[in-house]
Amino acid sequence: IYSDETVGCADDAVDILKKELSTYDREVFGIINLDTKGKVLNFNIVSVGTLNSSAAHPRETFKTAILSNSASFIAIHNHPSGFPNPSPEDLLTTQRLYEAGELIGIEMLDHIIVAENKIFSFAENNLLGKTFKEAKLMLGMNDNTIDYRKNNFRNNGTTYTVIARNNN
């Protein structure tokens, strides 16, 4: 179904899966497996979670990538809340998947969060390959800044900049 599609950027991946991801009322985590030319081999839903979380363990994530003989993959999940900003859990998941991909030789090209008509791309924000601590610092997070799942801004003097863009 996706075999004629080539993915060169976050917008391409979102265009392919926008309809699929918009049908869920809870978080869904999946991967797009790609061949050496960037053509889509398949899309696999790794997990269907709750309203504000979805587990993505490397074991389940890489199962179809390995079976499909993928050269690379793009992780993608939705935020039904409408806020595309990554949570601390999203940062940790990305770091783990990136490191696992390096170990087994399947390159992680991006992790994209889709929320209504906005997206957040880890690649476009230069967060792939960063440690959890580095990514948190780059996003201006600290332990007291924001609980993204509750959208509860704490009054600690830290300003919050939305690192999202409209996906028209």
Tell me the role of every PLM-derived stretch.
Residues 12-15, 37, 47-138:
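Active-site-proximal loop/helix of nucleotide/amide-processing enzymes and allied scaffolds
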Residues 154-168:
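Non-Sec secretion/translocation targeting segments of pathogen effectors
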Residues 31, 111, 160-162:
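Generic short beta-strand
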Residues 4, 71, 143, 159-160:
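Low-complexity, intrinsically disordered short peptide segments enriched in small/polar/basic residues
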